[in-house]
């Protein structure tokens, strides 16, 4: 331990009494290299030995964060790290002549930089170059790493909202140099997602790169560019919980109006209340959706549900009118008696009180309302008691006829009420199946 402390003290004394010239040798060599490199250097011209030579630029993009996705204005804001690499023919040296100095870092404004810009930028601000350093190696290789906040146009397709996926392209290319002067190529087949910060609304599926060579109407020479396509899928959990599931529950509640007794007086009120609730959710959905030509999937579901509730409410009103048909109403038509009160009532297990399920009551013919035969005309020649019996029988027959008429009217009223119950049971099954199928179709899209 004492020997180690002795060597440390000796090293400290040597550093203390060394001349400053020895300590700054590397710094002096870097200054000398800088002066030698930039003595006759200009950043205004392409750094190529031959003007006919094409300068190759390699472009690499790292996605760091999705700042904003403005669906209404269709603008995507990203935070990127952009790396550009090229070879400068005038920035090379022999490392042995400069103390094995292999690379230097200098401000990027001092060297020539490719005028690569984002073609589909969505703001009016002029492109600004980041004031970061470039790394220059002894063989002339230049690497420029710069952060950038980009605002690019992105066509948003909301036809499958909230289960939609978007494709947003970022196209980079030279603004003034054609393909014969500057050729840009991507490094690798896709952008890097190693340092990506997860977004709460969007899930990134990838960011493949593709090189294109296009010819524009203004110029005859080709212009190469590199397009990075950002593949996004919306995280739909919040929309499912806040917009979709309430609509599903409400749509399943609407057919239950057919199960309410007609005498409760709440059948129509339930349908109107459900329709108002769907209207409120439709307004909330419209506020969160961008204006578009195509109707989103959830919007179609809302419209289909509102249409179903409207028809169910209208049918409920019709069924209530049938239920409250009075004794003076016409009899149930023969076809309705056979099809609805016969076969359909048996299939739906709608029966009268005391009638077992599955056995329909035989249809009775209307009772005969013929008056009793009149007594022969002329004076009564029978004994007095017989005349009183005939008068009593005549009054009893009249009372029986009135009772039979009242009973027939009551039976007509009961037939209409039974017909209303059959239609209630039938439309309950139909509309509940419709609501269930529509809800399953939408929910399957989330899987």
From Swiss-Prot:
Expressed in the outer hair cells of the cochlea and the neurons of dorsal root ganglia. Belongs to the ligand-gated ion channel (TC 1.A.9) family. Acetylcholine receptor (TC 1.A.9.1) subfamily. Alpha-10/CHRNA10 sub-subfamily. Residues 323-425 are cytoplasmic. Changing residue 221 to Q: CHRNA9-CHRNA10 receptor is 25-fold less potently inhibited by the alpha-conotoxin RgIA. Component of neuronal acetylcholine receptors (nAChRs) that function as pentameric, ligand-gated cation channels with high calcium permeability among other activities. nAChRs are excitatory neurotrasnmitter receptors formed by a collection of nAChR subunits known to mediate synaptic transmission in the nervous system and the neuromuscular junction. Each nAchR subunit confers differential attributes to channel properties, including activation, deactivation and desensitization kinetics, pH sensitivity, cation permeability, and binding to allosteric modulators. Forms heteropentamers with CHRNA9. This is Neuronal acetylcholine receptor subunit alpha-10. GO terms for biological process: chemical synaptic transmission; detection of mechanical stimulus involved in sensory perception of sound; inner ear morphogenesis; membrane depolarization; monoatomic ion transmembrane transport; negative regulation of ERK1 and ERK2 cascade; positive regulation of cytosolic calcium ion concentration; regulation of membrane potential. Glycans are attached at residues 40, 56. The gene is Chrna10. Pfam families: Neur_chan_LBD, Neur_chan_memb. It is a multi-pass membrane protein. PROSITE patterns: NEUROTR_ION_CHANNEL. It catalyses: Ca(2+)(in) = Ca(2+)(out); Mg(2+)(in) = Mg(2+)(out); K(+)(in) = K(+)(out); Na(+)(in) = Na(+)(out). GO terms for molecular function: acetylcholine-gated monoatomic cation-selective channel activity; calcium channel activity; excitatory extracellular ligand-gated monoatomic ion channel activity; serotonin-gated monoatomic cation channel activity; transmitter-gated monoatomic ion channel activity involved in regulation of postsynaptic membrane potential. Residues 25-237 are extracellular. Residues 1-24 form the signal peptide. InterPro entries: Neur_chan_lig-bd, Neur_chan_lig-bd_sf, Neur_channel, Neuro-gated_channel_TM_sf, Neuro_actylchol_rec, Neurotrans-gated_channel_TM, Neurotransmitter_ion_chnl_CS, Nicotinic_acetylcholine_rcpt. Keywords: Calcium, Calcium channel, Calcium transport, Cell membrane, Disulfide bond, Glycoprotein, Ion channel, Ion transport, Ligand-gated ion channel, Membrane, Receptor, Signal, Synapse, Transmembrane, Transmembrane helix, Transport. The heterooligomeric receptor composed of CHRNA9 and CHRNA10 has an atypical pharmacological profile, binding several non-nicotinic ligands including strychnine (a glycine receptor antagonist) and atropine (a muscarinic acetylcholine receptor antagonist).
């Amino acid at each position: 331990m004492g020997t180690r402390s002795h060597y440390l003290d000796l090293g400290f004394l040597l550093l203390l009494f060394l001349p400053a010239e020895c300590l700054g040798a590397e710094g002096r060599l870097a200054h000398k290299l800088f002066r030698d490199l930039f003595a006759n250097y200009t950043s205004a011209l392409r750094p190529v030995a031959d003007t006919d030579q094409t300068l190759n630029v390699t472009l690499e993009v790292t996605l760091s964060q999705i700042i904003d996705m403005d669906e209404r204005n269709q603008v995507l804001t990203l935070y990127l790290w952009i790396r550009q690499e090229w070879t400068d023919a005038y920035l090379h040296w022999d490392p042995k002549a400069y103390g094995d100095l292999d690379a230097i870092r200098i401000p990027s404004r001092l060297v020539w930089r490719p005028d690569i810009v984002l073609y589909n930028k969505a703001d009016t601000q002029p492109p600004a170059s980041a004031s970061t350093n470039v790394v220059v190696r002894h063989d002339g290789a230049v690497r420029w790493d710069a952060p950038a906040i980009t605002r690019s146009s992105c066509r948003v397709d909301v036809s499958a909202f909230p289960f939609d996926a978007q494709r947003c392209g970022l196209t980079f290319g030279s603004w003034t140099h054609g393909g014969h002067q500057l050729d840009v190529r991507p490094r690798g087949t896709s952008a890097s997602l190693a340092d990506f910060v997860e977004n709460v609304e969007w899930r990134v599926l990838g960011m493949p790169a593709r090189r294109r060579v296009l010819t524009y109407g203004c110029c005859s020479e080709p212009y190469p560019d590199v397009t990075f396509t950002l593949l996004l899928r919306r995280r739909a959990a919040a929309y499912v919980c806040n917009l979709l599931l309430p609509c599903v529950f409400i749509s399943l509640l609407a057919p239950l109006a057919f199960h309410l007794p007609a005498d409760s007086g709440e059948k129509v009120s339930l349908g109107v209340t459900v329709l108002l609730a769907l209207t409120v959710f439709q307004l909330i959905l419209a506020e969160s959706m961008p204006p578009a030509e195509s109707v989103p999937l959830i919007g179609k579901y809302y419209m289909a549900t509102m249409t179903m509730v409207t028809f169910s409410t209208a049918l409920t009103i019709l069924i209530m009118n049938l239920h409250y048909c009075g004794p003076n109403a016409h009899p149930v038509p023969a076809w309705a008696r056979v099809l609805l009160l016969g076969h359909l009532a048996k299939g739906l297990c709608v029966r009268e009180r005391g009638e077992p399920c599955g056995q329909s009551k035989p249809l009775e013919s209307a009772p005969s309302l013929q008056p009793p035969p009149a007594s022969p005309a002329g004076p009564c020649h029978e004994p007095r008691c017989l005349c009183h019996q005939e008068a009593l029988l005549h009054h009893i027959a009249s009372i029986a006829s009135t009772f039979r008429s009242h009973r027939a009217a009551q039976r007509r009223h009961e037939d209409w009420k039974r017909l209303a119950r059959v239609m209630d049971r039938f439309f309950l099954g139909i509309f509940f199946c419709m609501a269930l199928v529509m809800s399953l179709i939408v929910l399957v899209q989330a899987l």
